[in-house]
Amino acid sequence: MTDKSKEGGSGKLLYCSFCGKSQHEVRKLIAGPSVYICDECVDLCNDIIREEIKDVLPKKESESLPTPREIREHLDDYVIGQEYAKKVLAVAVYNHYKRLRNGDTTAEGVELGKSNILLIGPTGSGKTLLAETLARFLDVPFTMADATTLTEAGYVGEDVENIIQKLLQKCDYDVAKAERGIVYIDEIDKISRKAENPSITRDVSGEGVQQALLKLVEGTVASVPPQGGRKHPQQEFLQVDTSKILFICGGAFAGLDKVIEQRVETGSGIGFGAEVRSKDETKTIGELFTQVEPEDLVKYGLIPEFIGRLPVTTTLTELDEEALIQILCEPKNALTKQYAALFELEDTELEFREDALRAIAKKAMNRKTGARGLRSILEGVLLETMYELPSSTDVSKVVIDESVINGESEPLLIYSNSDNQAAVAE
């Protein structure tokens, strides 16, 4: 290896055999049999190899693309119920990545469009969990955005381009990886137009955000500041093609059921011509959501252009008591399994009796928070036990029954030493 300050043994100046720079113009000059290469050319070669590897990696990933059935079976391991939504998502995601693998155009010249997804369902029904589980299974970058924090460019709040920057951060600013990612935009119903008719006043957090999202969701080349953008303003912006990114939008759409019901009722006549229904025949919110049409979403406040960018629409039903009990026990990362693992770290067994699980489910149903409320109920029930357990000795088992959930008694503590066996409170 030759330093730039030194000359060859013969006293003559040495030059890089590739770029022609002299040893004084570069930091290092590496000698080989009758040839030399400088450090700049070595860096350039490394960059070329890295780019080639990036081009090959997506092809390798796509070769093992799981089928819709395999995707749905994986979702079954983590998400209880919502069978129709899982099937729709599995097909949409499979078609999206199949399109990326084969390019936007088929051999016959048919252009394949992008199918972004809209999830409509009550809070705690599994919208976010479905999107997260999909991204984890497919091993692609995933980011979440809250639509309520977004505003038009130039106003206080998050710019829509920030969504792409978050996605880049998830994959260490690897543009090729980011372009195969999934973006989940939550609370999309909260950016609905404030009035049904377009207003002359500026709606920067409602219709304005929908307009800003149009191009991003459909597919555009977004310019995103590089890592540490403000610290290094001289760096060029990264160009990210969003036409390859799958966008999943989700929202509870509170009140949409009334819009659908009004349309359905109008279709069946009004006044003396109206169809009379008994109380039992009244449809649930979940049943009404399955009848959603684009016109209902327009009336709700989404602009037609934005709805057109989300061609795959699926609805999630409200979780009933049995589904909540299943969620507590059956998934791979079920809450009861998580808390049992925490107690296991203290060498203590945690047991939930059947009546306790049912009581937890009933409590969550009353709170109308869906599966999201289950963890807060368990935290409240187990707080004192988790506080005292690390300081206690000989506790081998903790038993939770219905009376504990209802606040009528404390958890039963079973000690390894039978002389100490007792309940915390009778």
From Swiss-Prot:
One of its GO terms (biological process) is cell division. InterPro entries: AAA+_ATPase, ATP-dep_Clp_protease_ClpX, ATPase_AAA_core, Clp_ATPase_C, Clp_protease_ATP-bd_su_ClpX, ClpX_bact, P-loop_NTPase, Znf_CppX_C4. ATP binds at residues 122-129. Residues 4-57 form the ClpX-type ZB domain. Keywords: ATP-binding, Chaperone, Metal-binding, Nucleotide-binding, Zinc. GO terms for molecular function: ATP binding; ATP hydrolysis activity; ATP-dependent protein folding chaperone; protein dimerization activity; unfolded protein binding; zinc ion binding. The keyword Ribonucleoprotein does not apply. It comes from the Bacteria. Signal peptide: none annotated. Zn(2+) binds at residues 16, 19, 38, 41. One of its GO terms (cellular component) is HslUV protease complex. Disulfide bonds: none annotated. It holds the Pfam family ClpB_D2-small. The keyword ATP-binding applies. Belongs to the ClpX chaperone family. Component of the ClpX-ClpP complex. Forms a hexameric ring that, in the presence of ATP, binds to fourteen ClpP subunits assembled into a disk-like structure with a central cavity, resembling the structure of eukaryotic proteasomes. ATP-dependent specificity component of the Clp protease. It directs the protease to specific substrates. Can perform chaperone functions in the absence of ClpP. This is ATP-dependent Clp protease ATP-binding subunit ClpX. The gene is clpX.
